[in-house]
From Swiss-Prot:
Keywords: Amino-acid biosynthesis, Cytoplasm, Diaminopimelate biosynthesis, Lysine biosynthesis, NAD, NADP, Oxidoreductase
EC number: 1.17.1.8
Database matches in PANTHER family: 4-HYDROXY-TETRAHYDRODIPICOLINATE REDUCTASE, DIHYDRODIPICOLINATE REDUCTASE
Designated gene of the protein: dapB
SUPFAM superfamilies in alphabetical order: Glyceraldehyde-3-phosphate dehydrogenase-like, C-terminal domain (SSF55347), NAD(P)-binding Rossmann-fold domains (SSF51735)
Function: Catalyzes the conversion of 4-hydroxy-tetrahydrodipicolinate (HTPA) to tetrahydrodipicolinate.
Protein name: 4-hydroxy-tetrahydrodipicolinate reductase
InterPro entries referenced in this protein's UniProt entry, alphabetically: DapB_C, DapB_N, DapB_N_CS, DHDPR_bac, NAD(P)-bd_dom_sf
NCBIfam families found in the cross-reference section: dapB
GO molecular function, one term: oxidoreductase activity, acting on CH or CH2 groups, NAD or NADP as acceptor
Phylogenetic placement of the source organism: Bacteria, Pseudomonadati, Pseudomonadota, Alphaproteobacteria, Rickettsiales
Bilayer-spanning residue ranges: none
Catalytic class of the enzyme: oxidoreductase
Length: 239
């Protein structure tokens, strides 16, 4: 039985994971951490868990990494809004621990990322823009998924990523991201490939949080026999 510690247990993703965990017979929630806990409670979270699924905040993640290293606890990180310093911490810790990070753990979003990569190779001279939409209470913008998609495309076309372009005219050497917030939208991401004669659109829409939660739990199971490294969902789905 795999003991999964859940960081961010009272958030939307944490609640969804708790709701569906019984679908997986080879794992259980061993310990929970949420915003009412003291950060030092992360010590017990890591001590009593084989792997942590983290959907918390960047501030919590920094402490979590330290305790995970102390107890040799594997990490599945789905927290978004991370900065360069957080990724440096993950890369350093991954020399000692198996860690999986993804801004979106659903198979659909990762398939979209693959399709974006392959489409970009074919539509080399097209302009590219990304539109993402989420519920009114989402704290970060643009979304981590939008940044993942933009990074994939920008890496192929050698483009700069722009958010909130304002009054400036679009440069040929950039990919723009636009964000909408409202209602109870779980997540919509659209990629537009545009030229003078046609527009090609790739789209993924999450109907609820279940696909993200399933991906996170599958990641925790997959990580059990893996050596120390920083992994992504592409390593699981082979896309």
């Amino acid at each position: 039985m795999i003991n999964i510690g859940l960081s961010g247990a009272t958030g939307k993703m944490g609640k969804t994971i708790i709701e569906i965990i019984d679908q997986f017979k080879d794992c259980q929630i061993s310990e929970k951490f949420n915003s009412t806990n003291n950060l030092n409670d992360l010590d017990n979270l890591c001590k009593n868990s084989d792997v942590i699924i983290d959907f918390s905040t960047p501030e919590v993640l920094e402490k979590l990494i330290n305790y995970a290293l102390k107890h040799n606890t594997k990490l599945v990180i789905g927290t978004t809004g991370l900065k360069k310093q957080h990724f440096k911490l993950l890369e350093k810790a991954a020399k000692t621990l198996p860690i999986l990070y993804s801004a979106n753990m659903s198979i659909g979003a990762n398939l979209l990322n693959y399709l974006a990569k392959e489409s970009t190779k074919i539509l080399d001279d097209y302009d590219v823009e990304i539109l993402e939409m989420h519920h009114r209470n989402k704290k970060d913008a643009p979304s981590g998924t939008a940044l993942m998609l933009a990074s994939t495309i920008a890496g192929i076309k050698e483009l700069n990523i722009t958010f909130n372009r304002g009054n400036r005219i679009k440069s040929k050497k950039e990919i723009g991201i636009s964000s909408l917030r409202g209602g109870n939208v779980h997540g919509i991401h659209e990629i537009f490939f545009l030229d003078n004669d046609e527009i090609i659109t790739l789209k993924h829409e999450a109907l609820n949080k279940n696909s993200f939660a399933v991906g996170a739990i599958k990641s925790a199971i997959w990580l059990q026999d893996k050596p120390s490294a920083l992994y992504s969902m592409q390593d699981i789905y082979k896309v």
